[in-house]
């Protein structure tokens, strides 16, 4: 397992990054319900809709990332290895201000914690609390949603006042 980056090493590593993730596409059975989930729970905004020969869908954004919600009309456009009836992506992570608040919002729309995955990761057992706590939930069409107050290594900390301090090998040994 790689050691956490110090802030200086992080800055140096990020200066070499030439591309940034700006788009994630989800294949969904119900475009409207899936879009409504991300709008209602995470505050994303709808920025476009389309109905083309191979797919229909909408685009959502948080101001930094484009999230396409797609419903494919044929296997060729969806990709033959998956086909038009395959839905999902493994998981999408959201940095939030409060795990308790987002838990209430997720519960209100019928989303439940993935206790199996959370247990396997040790969430709630103390040792994960020392760094990042990622709590997994199930979203529309079984899409796994990951929520965290501290964000992930290698990403900007948009919620700096909520973020835990960066832990280096030196501070862990102190």
Where are these regions (language model features)?
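Vicinal oxygen chelate
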Residues: 2-5, 11-17, 20-30, 58-61, 80-174
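Generic short beta-strand segments
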Residues: 72-74, 118-119
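Short linear motifs in intrinsically disordered
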Residues: 46-51, 93-95, 122-128
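Short, P/G- and charge-enriched loop/turn segments at secondary-structure junctions
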Residues: 78-82, 122-124
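Core segments of cupin and vicinal oxygen chelate
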Residues: 15-16, 26-73
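Secondary-structure boundary/capping motif
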Residues: 28-44, 91, 113, 134, ...
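A short local loop/turn or secondary-structure capping micro-motif enriched for an aromatic residue
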Residues: 75-79, 153-156
């Amino acid at each position: 397992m790689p050691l956490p980056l110090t802030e200086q090493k992080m800055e140096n590593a990020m200066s070499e990054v030439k591309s940034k993730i700006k788009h994630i596409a989800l294949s969904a059975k119900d475009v409207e319900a899936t879009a409504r989930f991300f709008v209602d729970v995470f505050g994303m905004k709808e920025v476009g809709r389309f109905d083309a020969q191979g797919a229909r869908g909408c685009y959502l954004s948080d101001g930094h990332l484009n999230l396409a919600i797609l419903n494919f009309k044929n296997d060729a456009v969806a990709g033959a290895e998956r086909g038009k009836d395959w839905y999902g992506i493994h998981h999408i992570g959201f940095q939030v201000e409060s795990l308790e608040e987002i838990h209430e919002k997720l519960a209100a729309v019928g989303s439940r914690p993935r206790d199996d995955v959370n247990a396997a990761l040790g969430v709630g057992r103390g040792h994960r609390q020392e760094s990042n706590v990622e709590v997994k939930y199930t979203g529309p069409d079984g899409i796994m949603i990951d929520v965290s107050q501290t964000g992930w290594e290698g990403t900007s900390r948009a919620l700096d006042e909520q973020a835990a301090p960066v832990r280096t090998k030196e501070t862990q040994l102190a």
